[in-house]
Amino acid sequence: MDQFVIQGGTSLAGEVTISGAKNAALPILFAALLADGKSTFTNVPRLRDIVTTEALLKTLGASVNWQGDTLVIDGATVDKTLAPYDLVKQMRASVLTLGPLVARFGEAQVSLPGGCAIGARPVDIHIQGLERMGAQINVENGYINAKVNGRLKGAEIFMEMVSVGATENLLMAATLADGKTVLENAACEPEITDLANCLIAMGAKITGAGTNRIEIEGVERLAGCEHRILPDRIETGTFLVAAAMAGGEVLCKMTDFHSLEPVIEKLRATNALLEVHDNSIYLDMRGRELKAVNIKTAPHPGFPTDMQAQFTALNVVANGSATITETIFENRFMHVPELQRMGANIRLEGNTAICGDTKTLSGAQVMATDLRASASLILTGIVAQGETIVDRIYHVDRGYERIEDKLSALGANIKRRSS
């Protein structure tokens, strides 16, 4: 099993090219199941979750071919509707096959999902929405079994809580439904808008994506399309935080500041100098005092939960004390005990982490527990004194493309090795 070995105490400076967004790519690749032709997706990141998605699409019968950072998927060859446990257990996003399969083929058998262990994240909202559209669903033996006679029917669906995954699943399903579907209390994340733009390119009729009310007028068929995956706002934020923690500078290229405004606002509050342009963001923390900032996660356009762990790490090395409150997931502070092993002054009170002044951070052997937690441990290892070893880095490979190469290019002393 691979691990990262980090020699701490280095500064960071340079440029980094941001990859395509994992959280946009996954639903968009599954959207290819809706089309009866070839779809070409560019700016696709080479990640563990993308490899899992590729394997799942092939299992369903799709033709999948890589050409550089381009993925060509032919949905015309799909001839199976069973998403098996051995693949779905690796990634929660696999449940996004449910909506497209039942919408196009009238049936689906999808294993209950796996992925990061950061909360229950039940699929009830997905199931309830599809039932409102006429699907008959039962869950038994670890599988969601869905059937519909004929086409799904358009419906008005109010989601009891904001759910990115449920919004994506129901949005995809509604594109082939008979009639109009309205999704109320929908998620507003940029990745939802990117998915909608892709579906529109396939021939879907969608308005309101990016707001909490999305309207979809169903069509009888969708064709293949060409679509470029939007830049990864979380990867961008991670590298900006890394430079701020290390007292350095970084230019993030091929990114979009519009999707990252809550993070940029908080970075400015840390006393970082930031310059934003149409497709790049520059941060400079050289010679400046890093200040702790209070964070409260919220659905978009609030502060993203996927940046919570990185800002926890930032507050550990910043001057002053601050609180980090997590409102999205109930179990997303598993990085805190690992940071404490490195000397971090943090205590937990319910869903809030209280970060105080930390005198010294020392390298230690720590364990990644989920994707973003692993990023926080890597960033802390870069600024800690001595050697840090991060185990179970398969988590980071799920969502960051060549993170060690990109950090090394900025000056970090980080190497991958087999333990």
Swiss-Prot record:
Lineage, top-rank taxon, reads Bacteria
Which sites are catalytic? 116 (proton donor)
Has keyword Cell cycle? yes
Q: Where in the cell is it found?
A: Cytoplasm
Binding residues for UDP-N-acetyl-alpha-D-glucosamine, per the UniProt record? 92, 306, 328
Pathway named in the protein's UniProt entry: Cell wall biogenesis; peptidoglycan biosynthesis
Q: Which InterPro entries match?
A: Enolpyruvate_Tfrase_dom, Enolpyruvate_Tfrase_sf, MurA_subfamily, RNA3'P_cycl/enolpyr_Trfase_a/b, UDP_GlcNAc_COvinyl_MurA
Give an example GO molecular function. UDP-N-acetylglucosamine 1-carboxyvinyltransferase activity
- Documented EC number(s): 2.5.1.7
Binding residues annotated for phosphoenolpyruvate, in chain numbering: 22-23
Name the chemical reaction catalysed here: phosphoenolpyruvate + UDP-N-acetyl-alpha-D-glucosamine = UDP-N-acetyl-3-O-(1-carboxyvinyl)-alpha-D-glucosamine + phosphate
Q: Carries keyword Cell division?
A: yes
Tell me which UniProt keywords the record has, alphabetically: Cell cycle, Cell division, Cell shape, Cell wall biogenesis/degradation, Cytoplasm, Peptidoglycan synthesis, Pyruvate, Transferase
One GO cellular component, as annotated:
cytoplasm
Give the protein family. Belongs to the EPSP synthase family. MurA subfamily.
Q: What does this protein do?
A: Cell wall formation. Adds enolpyruvyl to UDP-N-acetylglucosamine.
Q: What is this protein called?
A: UDP-N-acetylglucosamine 1-carboxyvinyltransferase
Organism the protein comes from: Pseudoalteromonas translucida (strain TAC 125)
Name the gene.
Answer: murA
